[in-house]
Amino acid sequence: MAEKIRVGLFFGGNSSEHDVSKRSAKNYYDALDPEKYQIFPVLISKKGIMIDSETSKRVLFGEDEDELLAGLPNKNADIFGPIDSIRNLKLDVLFPSVHGNLGEDGTLAGLFRLMNIPYVGSGLRAHAISFDKVITKELMTVNGIRNTKYIVIFQNDKNKPDWDSVSKQLGEVVFVKAANQGSSVGVSRVTNAEEYENALRDSFQYDEKLLVEKAVESPTELEIGLLGNDRVITSPIGAHWAPGQDHGSGWFDYKNKFVDNSKMKYQIPAKISPAKSKELENMAVKAYKVLGIKGFARIDFLMSKDGEIFLSEPNTLPGNTNMSLFPILFEAAGMNRSQQAEKLIQLAFEEFKREQNISYSFKELGSEKLGQFDIKK
Protein backbone atom coordinates (compact mmCIF):
# COMPACT_ATOMS: atom_id res chain seq x y z
CA MET A 1 0.00 0.00 0.00
CA ALA A 2 1.40 3.41 -1.00
CA GLU A 3 2.23 5.85 1.74
CA LYS A 4 -0.34 8.54 2.31
CA ILE A 5 0.42 12.07 1.15
CA ARG A 6 0.92 14.26 4.21
CA VAL A 7 -1.04 17.49 3.83
CA GLY A 8 -0.67 20.56 6.03
CA LEU A 9 -4.07 22.32 6.04
CA PHE A 10 -3.67 25.93 7.17
CA PHE A 11 -6.66 27.96 8.36
CA GLY A 12 -7.70 30.85 10.60
CA GLY A 13 -5.59 33.99 10.48
CA ASN A 14 -5.91 37.47 11.92
CA SER A 15 -8.43 38.88 9.43
CA SER A 16 -12.18 39.39 9.63
CA GLU A 17 -12.55 36.10 7.72
CA HIS A 18 -11.06 33.95 10.50
CA ASP A 19 -14.24 31.94 11.08
CA VAL A 20 -15.03 31.71 7.36
CA SER A 21 -11.58 30.19 6.90
CA LYS A 22 -12.43 27.49 9.45
CA ARG A 23 -15.51 26.48 7.47
CA SER A 24 -13.54 26.43 4.22
CA ALA A 25 -10.80 24.28 5.76
CA LYS A 26 -13.27 21.83 7.32
CA ASN A 27 -14.82 21.25 3.90
CA TYR A 28 -11.37 20.60 2.40
CA TYR A 29 -10.63 18.20 5.26
CA ASP A 30 -13.85 16.30 4.57
CA ALA A 31 -13.29 16.33 0.80
CA LEU A 32 -9.83 14.74 0.77
CA ASP A 33 -9.78 10.94 0.59
CA PRO A 34 -8.53 9.59 3.97
CA GLU A 35 -7.20 6.49 2.18
CA LYS A 36 -4.85 8.68 0.16
CA TYR A 37 -4.17 11.70 2.37
CA GLN A 38 -3.13 12.20 5.97
CA ILE A 39 -4.21 15.69 6.96
CA PHE A 40 -2.53 17.83 9.61
CA PRO A 41 -4.61 20.94 10.40
CA VAL A 42 -2.58 24.02 11.36
CA LEU A 43 -4.49 26.89 12.93
CA ILE A 44 -3.21 30.45 12.74
CA SER A 45 -4.73 32.20 15.74
CA LYS A 46 -6.40 35.61 15.74
CA LYS A 47 -3.07 36.94 17.04
CA GLY A 48 -1.25 35.49 14.03
CA ILE A 49 0.41 32.64 15.95
CA MET A 50 0.70 29.12 14.49
CA ILE A 51 -0.84 26.49 16.77
CA ASP A 52 0.20 22.85 17.07
CA SER A 53 -1.64 20.39 14.85
CA GLU A 54 -3.35 18.44 17.63
CA THR A 55 -4.93 21.56 19.12
CA SER A 56 -5.68 22.87 15.63
CA LYS A 57 -7.64 19.74 14.76
CA ARG A 58 -9.78 20.15 17.87
CA VAL A 59 -10.60 23.72 16.82
CA LEU A 60 -11.36 22.61 13.25
CA PHE A 61 -13.81 20.04 14.58
CA GLY A 62 -15.74 22.59 16.60
CA GLU A 63 -14.17 22.97 20.04
CA ASP A 64 -14.05 26.50 21.43
CA GLU A 65 -10.93 28.18 20.09
CA ASP A 66 -10.60 30.84 22.78
CA GLU A 67 -10.83 28.27 25.58
CA LEU A 68 -8.34 25.90 23.95
CA LEU A 69 -5.80 28.63 23.28
CA ALA A 70 -6.11 30.39 26.63
CA GLY A 71 -2.79 30.25 28.41
CA LEU A 72 -0.85 28.73 25.53
CA PRO A 73 2.64 30.24 25.32
CA ASN A 74 3.40 32.44 22.33
CA LYS A 75 6.23 30.09 21.39
CA ASN A 76 5.60 30.44 17.66
CA ALA A 77 5.59 34.22 17.62
CA ASP A 78 9.01 34.34 15.92
CA ILE A 79 9.91 33.16 12.42
CA PHE A 80 11.69 30.00 13.56
CA GLY A 81 8.76 28.61 15.56
CA PRO A 82 6.40 28.14 12.59
CA ILE A 83 9.15 26.76 10.37
CA ASP A 84 10.21 24.21 12.97
CA SER A 85 6.59 23.22 13.62
CA ILE A 86 5.93 22.61 9.93
CA ARG A 87 9.20 20.75 9.35
CA ASN A 88 8.52 18.44 12.29
CA LEU A 89 5.30 17.29 10.63
CA LYS A 90 7.29 16.12 7.56
CA LEU A 91 4.62 17.41 5.22
CA ASP A 92 4.53 16.64 1.50
CA VAL A 93 2.31 19.55 0.48
CA LEU A 94 0.94 22.68 2.15
CA PHE A 95 -2.69 23.67 1.60
CA PRO A 96 -3.59 27.23 2.65
CA SER A 97 -7.21 28.05 3.44
CA VAL A 98 -6.49 31.41 5.08
CA HIS A 99 -8.47 34.31 3.64
CA GLY A 100 -7.54 37.98 3.86
CA ASN A 101 -4.39 39.00 5.72
CA LEU A 102 -1.61 36.36 5.95
CA GLY A 103 -3.27 34.26 3.24
CA GLU A 104 -4.42 36.25 0.23
CA ASP A 105 -1.76 38.92 0.72
CA GLY A 106 1.01 36.38 0.02
CA THR A 107 2.51 36.08 3.50
CA LEU A 108 2.00 32.33 3.80
CA ALA A 109 3.08 31.68 0.22
CA GLY A 110 6.36 33.45 0.97
CA LEU A 111 6.91 31.29 4.04
CA PHE A 112 6.06 28.14 2.11
CA ARG A 113 8.48 28.98 -0.67
CA LEU A 114 11.21 29.69 1.86
CA MET A 115 10.65 26.17 3.19
CA ASN A 116 10.88 24.65 -0.31
CA ILE A 117 7.74 22.53 0.08
CA PRO A 118 5.01 22.26 -2.61
CA TYR A 119 1.97 24.40 -1.80
CA VAL A 120 -1.49 24.98 -3.22
CA GLY A 121 -2.21 28.21 -5.06
CA SER A 122 -0.28 31.24 -6.17
CA GLY A 123 3.11 32.49 -5.11
CA LEU A 124 3.78 35.55 -2.99
CA ARG A 125 3.99 37.98 -5.91
CA ALA A 126 0.67 37.02 -7.53
CA HIS A 127 -1.14 37.03 -4.19
CA ALA A 128 0.25 40.42 -3.17
CA ILE A 129 -0.48 42.06 -6.54
CA SER A 130 -3.99 40.63 -6.75
CA PHE A 131 -4.81 41.58 -3.15
CA ASP A 132 -3.94 45.24 -3.80
CA LYS A 133 -6.96 46.70 -5.58
CA VAL A 134 -5.02 49.67 -6.93
CA ILE A 135 -2.14 47.66 -8.41
CA THR A 136 -4.64 45.19 -9.89
CA LYS A 137 -6.56 47.98 -11.64
CA GLU A 138 -3.36 49.57 -12.93
CA LEU A 139 -2.25 46.25 -14.42
CA MET A 140 -5.67 45.62 -15.93
CA THR A 141 -5.69 49.09 -17.51
CA VAL A 142 -2.19 48.71 -18.98
CA ASN A 143 -3.14 45.33 -20.46
CA GLY A 144 -6.41 46.47 -22.01
CA ILE A 145 -8.73 44.64 -19.60
CA ARG A 146 -11.76 46.85 -19.04
CA ASN A 147 -12.35 48.04 -15.47
CA THR A 148 -14.15 50.97 -13.89
CA LYS A 149 -12.71 54.49 -13.81
CA TYR A 150 -10.94 55.28 -10.53
CA ILE A 151 -8.68 57.55 -8.51
CA VAL A 152 -6.28 56.74 -5.66
CA ILE A 153 -6.07 58.62 -2.36
CA PHE A 154 -3.28 58.22 0.20
CA GLN A 155 -3.72 58.97 3.88
CA ASN A 156 -0.77 61.35 3.95
CA ASP A 157 -1.96 63.36 0.93
CA LYS A 158 -2.07 67.01 1.98
CA ASN A 159 -4.71 67.96 -0.57
CA LYS A 160 -7.19 65.10 -0.75
CA PRO A 161 -9.85 65.60 -3.42
CA ASP A 162 -13.19 66.83 -2.09
CA TRP A 163 -16.56 65.42 -3.08
CA ASP A 164 -17.15 67.99 -5.81
CA SER A 165 -13.88 67.03 -7.48
CA VAL A 166 -14.51 63.29 -7.13
CA SER A 167 -18.09 63.42 -8.40
CA LYS A 168 -17.03 65.47 -11.44
CA GLN A 169 -14.41 62.86 -12.33
CA LEU A 170 -16.29 59.68 -11.47
CA GLY A 171 -19.99 60.49 -11.28
CA GLU A 172 -22.57 60.89 -8.53
CA VAL A 173 -22.23 57.31 -7.20
CA VAL A 174 -18.83 55.89 -6.24
CA PHE A 175 -17.33 53.21 -4.04
CA VAL A 176 -14.58 54.01 -1.54
CA LYS A 177 -12.43 50.95 -0.78
CA ALA A 178 -9.44 50.17 1.40
CA ALA A 179 -6.86 48.99 -1.14
CA ASN A 180 -5.69 45.93 0.79
CA GLN A 181 -8.74 44.36 2.41
CA GLY A 182 -11.14 41.63 1.39
CA SER A 183 -14.76 40.71 2.11
CA SER A 184 -16.01 44.27 1.62
CA VAL A 185 -14.19 45.41 4.78
CA GLY A 186 -13.51 49.13 4.52
CA VAL A 187 -15.89 49.53 1.57
CA SER A 188 -18.62 52.18 1.35
CA ARG A 189 -21.11 53.21 -1.32
CA VAL A 190 -21.11 57.00 -1.54
CA THR A 191 -23.62 59.43 -3.08
CA ASN A 192 -22.93 62.77 -1.32
CA ALA A 193 -20.30 64.83 0.47
CA GLU A 194 -21.20 63.67 3.98
CA GLU A 195 -21.07 59.99 3.00
CA TYR A 196 -17.77 60.63 1.24
CA GLU A 197 -16.09 62.12 4.32
CA ASN A 198 -17.44 59.31 6.51
CA ALA A 199 -16.22 56.71 4.00
CA LEU A 200 -12.70 58.17 3.97
CA ARG A 201 -12.54 58.05 7.78
CA ASP A 202 -13.81 54.47 7.83
CA SER A 203 -11.58 53.11 5.07
CA PHE A 204 -8.43 54.79 6.40
CA GLN A 205 -8.83 52.63 9.52
CA TYR A 206 -7.93 49.64 7.36
CA ASP A 207 -5.33 50.96 4.92
CA GLU A 208 -3.29 54.05 4.14
CA LYS A 209 -4.20 53.76 0.45
CA LEU A 210 -7.76 53.99 -0.84
CA LEU A 211 -9.38 53.24 -4.18
CA VAL A 212 -12.30 55.43 -5.20
CA GLU A 213 -14.07 54.02 -8.25
CA LYS A 214 -17.04 54.87 -10.40
CA ALA A 215 -20.10 52.74 -9.68
CA VAL A 216 -21.70 50.71 -12.45
CA GLU A 217 -25.41 51.52 -12.45
CA SER A 218 -27.65 48.54 -11.61
CA PRO A 219 -24.99 45.98 -12.52
CA THR A 220 -25.33 42.26 -12.99
CA GLU A 221 -22.71 40.70 -10.69
CA LEU A 222 -20.94 37.85 -12.48
CA GLU A 223 -18.15 35.52 -11.49
CA ILE A 224 -16.09 32.74 -12.99
CA GLY A 225 -13.80 30.13 -11.45
CA LEU A 226 -10.42 29.24 -12.93
CA LEU A 227 -8.25 26.18 -12.28
CA GLY A 228 -4.74 25.62 -13.56
CA ASN A 229 -1.18 26.85 -13.80
CA ASP A 230 -0.08 27.52 -17.38
CA ARG A 231 -3.09 25.70 -18.81
CA VAL A 232 -6.32 27.07 -17.36
CA ILE A 233 -9.82 25.60 -17.31
CA THR A 234 -12.84 27.74 -16.52
CA SER A 235 -16.12 27.09 -14.77
CA PRO A 236 -19.54 28.12 -16.00
CA ILE A 237 -20.23 31.81 -15.40
CA GLY A 238 -22.45 32.51 -12.42
CA ALA A 239 -24.63 35.45 -11.43
CA HIS A 240 -25.65 36.20 -7.87
CA TRP A 241 -27.40 38.85 -5.84
CA ALA A 242 -27.90 39.61 -2.18
CA PRO A 243 -30.83 38.65 0.08
CA GLY A 244 -33.80 41.01 -0.22
CA GLN A 245 -32.56 42.51 -3.47
CA ASP A 246 -33.70 42.13 -7.03
CA HIS A 247 -31.27 40.88 -9.63
CA GLY A 248 -28.87 43.74 -10.40
CA SER A 249 -30.17 46.13 -7.73
CA GLY A 250 -27.52 46.12 -5.02
CA TRP A 251 -24.00 45.37 -3.86
CA PHE A 252 -22.42 42.90 -1.46
CA ASP A 253 -21.32 44.26 1.90
CA TYR A 254 -19.78 42.12 4.67
CA LYS A 255 -23.22 41.26 6.09
CA ASN A 256 -24.49 40.03 2.71
CA LYS A 257 -21.43 37.85 2.22
CA PHE A 258 -21.06 36.20 5.61
CA VAL A 259 -23.86 37.02 8.06
CA ASP A 260 -26.97 36.66 5.93
CA ASN A 261 -25.80 34.59 2.98
CA SER A 262 -28.13 31.64 3.56
CA LYS A 263 -30.66 33.31 1.23
CA MET A 264 -28.12 34.22 -1.45
CA LYS A 265 -29.61 33.91 -4.92
CA TYR A 266 -27.65 32.21 -7.70
CA GLN A 267 -28.05 31.76 -11.41
CA ILE A 268 -25.69 29.17 -12.93
CA PRO A 269 -25.07 29.46 -15.77
CA ALA A 270 -25.77 33.17 -15.90
CA LYS A 271 -28.36 34.21 -18.47
CA ILE A 272 -26.08 36.24 -20.71
CA SER A 273 -25.47 35.84 -24.43
CA PRO A 274 -22.86 33.39 -25.76
CA ALA A 275 -20.88 36.36 -27.09
CA LYS A 276 -20.81 38.05 -23.67
CA SER A 277 -19.92 34.75 -22.00
CA LYS A 278 -16.95 34.32 -24.33
CA GLU A 279 -15.86 37.93 -23.80
CA LEU A 280 -15.92 37.52 -20.02
CA GLU A 281 -14.08 34.19 -20.16
CA ASN A 282 -11.34 35.70 -22.33
CA MET A 283 -10.98 38.66 -19.96
CA ALA A 284 -10.73 36.31 -16.98
CA VAL A 285 -8.07 34.06 -18.50
CA LYS A 286 -6.03 37.08 -19.61
CA ALA A 287 -6.23 38.63 -16.14
CA TYR A 288 -5.26 35.30 -14.54
CA LYS A 289 -2.11 35.18 -16.66
CA VAL A 290 -1.26 38.89 -16.34
CA LEU A 291 -1.42 38.61 -12.55
CA GLY A 292 0.65 35.41 -12.55
CA ILE A 293 -1.99 33.42 -10.67
CA LYS A 294 -1.40 29.71 -10.15
CA GLY A 295 -3.64 26.91 -8.93
CA PHE A 296 -7.01 28.59 -8.74
CA ALA A 297 -8.93 31.83 -8.47
CA ARG A 298 -12.37 33.32 -8.68
CA ILE A 299 -12.63 36.52 -10.70
CA ASP A 300 -15.61 38.83 -10.27
CA PHE A 301 -17.11 41.03 -12.96
CA LEU A 302 -19.84 43.64 -13.33
CA MET A 303 -22.04 43.93 -16.41
CA SER A 304 -23.81 47.23 -17.01
CA LYS A 305 -27.37 47.55 -18.26
CA ASP A 306 -26.09 48.08 -21.80
CA GLY A 307 -23.99 44.91 -21.67
CA GLU A 308 -20.55 46.38 -21.02
CA ILE A 309 -18.39 44.04 -18.90
CA PHE A 310 -15.95 45.35 -16.28
CA LEU A 311 -13.46 43.30 -14.27
CA SER A 312 -14.19 43.93 -10.59
CA GLU A 313 -11.53 42.00 -8.69
CA PRO A 314 -9.71 38.66 -8.47
CA ASN A 315 -9.69 36.38 -5.44
CA THR A 316 -6.59 34.17 -5.28
CA LEU A 317 -7.76 32.08 -2.30
CA PRO A 318 -11.50 31.68 -2.90
CA GLY A 319 -13.65 30.33 -0.11
CA ASN A 320 -14.77 26.73 0.21
CA THR A 321 -17.76 27.05 2.53
CA ASN A 322 -21.14 25.56 1.69
CA MET A 323 -22.17 28.91 0.21
CA SER A 324 -18.86 29.80 -1.49
CA LEU A 325 -19.16 30.51 -5.20
CA PHE A 326 -15.94 28.93 -6.48
CA PRO A 327 -16.76 25.31 -5.54
CA ILE A 328 -20.39 25.77 -6.53
CA LEU A 329 -19.37 26.96 -9.99
CA PHE A 330 -17.17 23.93 -10.59
CA GLU A 331 -19.78 21.59 -9.13
CA ALA A 332 -22.08 22.94 -11.84
CA ALA A 333 -19.45 21.79 -14.35
CA GLY A 334 -19.51 18.26 -12.91
CA MET A 335 -16.41 18.48 -10.69
CA ASN A 336 -17.27 17.64 -7.09
CA ARG A 337 -15.41 19.05 -4.08
CA SER A 338 -13.20 16.00 -3.66
CA GLN A 339 -12.12 16.26 -7.28
CA GLN A 340 -11.49 19.99 -6.87
CA ALA A 341 -9.27 19.47 -3.80
CA GLU A 342 -7.40 16.63 -5.52
CA LYS A 343 -6.81 18.82 -8.58
CA LEU A 344 -5.43 21.65 -6.45
CA ILE A 345 -2.89 19.32 -4.84
CA GLN A 346 -1.90 17.92 -8.24
CA LEU A 347 -1.35 21.47 -9.52
CA ALA A 348 0.77 22.26 -6.45
CA PHE A 349 3.14 19.38 -7.21
CA GLU A 350 3.30 20.35 -10.89
CA GLU A 351 4.15 23.98 -10.13
CA PHE A 352 6.77 22.96 -7.56
CA LYS A 353 8.43 20.69 -10.13
CA ARG A 354 8.45 23.51 -12.68
CA GLU A 355 10.01 25.92 -10.20
CA GLN A 356 12.76 23.44 -9.35
CA ASN A 357 13.93 23.68 -12.96
CA ILE A 358 14.30 27.45 -12.79
CA SER A 359 17.70 28.85 -11.89
CA TYR A 360 17.57 31.82 -9.54
CA SER A 361 21.32 32.32 -9.39
CA PHE A 362 24.15 32.75 -11.86
CA LYS A 363 27.89 33.01 -11.93
CA GLU A 364 28.89 36.37 -13.27
CA LEU A 365 31.60 36.28 -15.90
CA GLY A 366 34.86 36.91 -14.12
CA SER A 367 33.23 36.72 -10.67
CA GLU A 368 36.08 34.54 -9.44
CA LYS A 369 38.23 37.65 -9.69
CA LEU A 370 35.91 39.96 -7.78
CA GLY A 371 37.82 41.72 -5.06
CA GLN A 372 41.12 41.45 -6.91
CA PHE A 373 42.26 44.78 -8.23
CA ASP A 374 45.26 45.65 -10.34
CA ILE A 375 45.94 49.23 -9.42
CA LYS A 376 48.30 50.84 -11.86
CA LYS A 377 50.26 53.84 -10.74
From Swiss-Prot:
List of residues binding Mg(2+) 2: 313, 315
Cofactor comment text: Binds 2 magnesium or manganese ions per subunit.
Residue ranges annotated for the ATP-grasp domain, each copy included: 137-346
Molecular function GO terms recorded: ATP binding; D-alanine-D-alanine ligase activity; metal ion binding
Record carries keyword Cytoplasm: yes
Catalytic activity: 2 D-alanine + ATP = D-alanyl-D-alanine + ADP + phosphate + H(+)
Keyword tags: ATP-binding, Cell shape, Cell wall biogenesis/degradation, Cytoplasm, Ligase, Magnesium, Manganese, Metal-binding, Nucleotide-binding, Peptidoglycan synthesis
Positions contributing to ATP binding: 167-222
Record-annotated membrane-spanning stretches: none
Biochemical pathway: Cell wall biogenesis; peptidoglycan biosynthesis
EC number(s) per entry: 6.3.2.4
Single Gene Ontology BP annotation: peptidoglycan biosynthetic process
RNA-binding is among the record's keywords: no
Localisation per UniProt entry: Cytoplasm
Residues noted as binding Mg(2+) 1 in the record, renumbered to the chain: 300, 313
GO cellular component, one term: cytosol
Cofactor(s), names only, from the UniProt record: Mg(2+); Mn(2+)
InterPro entries for this protein: ATP-grasp, ATP_grasp_subdomain_1, D-Ala_lig_Van_CS, D_ala_D_ala, Dala_Dala_lig_C, Dala_Dala_lig_N, PreATP-grasp_dom_sf
Cited Pfam families: Dala_Dala_lig_C, Dala_Dala_lig_N
Family label: Belongs to the D-alanine--D-alanine ligase family.
NCBIfam families referenced in this protein's UniProt entry, alphabetically: D_ala_D_alaTIGR, PRK01966.1-4
Function: Cell wall formation.
Descriptive protein name: D-alanine--D-alanine ligase
Gene: ddl
